[in-house]
């Protein structure tokens, strides 16, 4: 997804994080690594990463859910947070998931 200030209606997600670590936060398949909070990322990118992880079990997140995750952000701000996660190798554009998809990677 290009940073054009617009978001796809549905962003497809693929989990490539590997096994759930012992210190994971969350329940069942809906978990994230707490180390996200100590990374040198914007607050929006940190919150978005945790939010995306909570939707991995569904394999997708809808635009309305992205907006709810980052309530005070514009669509352009959400797109910028997605790009920040790509730059920091926490998200990988997933061509097999479609033009609006990402593979979510583990921290470290």
Residue ranges with predicted function:
Residues 52-108:
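Winged helix-turn-helix DNA-binding recognition segment
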Residues 1-65:
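Short recognition helix of helix-turn-helix/winged-helix DNA-binding domains
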């Amino acid at each position: 997804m290009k940073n054009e200030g617009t978001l796809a209606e549905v962003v497809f997600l693929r989990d490539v994080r590997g096994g759930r670590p012992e210190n994971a936060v969350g329940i069942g398949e809906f978990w994230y690594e707490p180390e996200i909070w100590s990374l040198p990322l914007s607050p929006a990118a940190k919150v978005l990463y945790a939010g995306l992880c909570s939707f991995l079990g569904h394999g997708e997140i809808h635009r309305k859910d992205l907006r709810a995750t980052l309530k005070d952000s514009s669509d352009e701000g959400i797109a910028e947070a997605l790009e920040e996660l790509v730059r920091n190798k926490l998200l990988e554009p997933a061509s097999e998931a479609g033009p609006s998809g990402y593979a979510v990677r583990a921290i470290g």
